[in-house]
């Protein structure tokens, strides 16, 4: 699992 997915940056 990535710590900063695009969904969160989003």
Swiss-Prot record:
Keywords: Antibiotic, Antimicrobial, Bacteriocin, Secreted. GO terms for cellular component: extracellular region. GO terms for biological process: defense response to bacterium; killing of cells of another organism. It comes from the Bacteria. It is found in: Secreted. Has antibacterial activity against the Gram-positive bacteria L.monocytogenes, L.lactis subsp lactis and L.curvatus H28, but not against the Gram-positive bacteria L.curvatus CWBI-B28, L.brevis and L.plantarum or the Gram-negative bacteria E.coli and Pseudomonas sp 55. Has no antifungal activity against S.cerevisiae, Penicillium sp BKS-TAN2 or A.niger. This is Bioactive peptide 2. It comes from Latilactobacillus curvatus (Lactobacillus curvatus). The lineage of its organism: Bacteria, Bacillati, Bacillota, Bacilli, Lactobacillales.
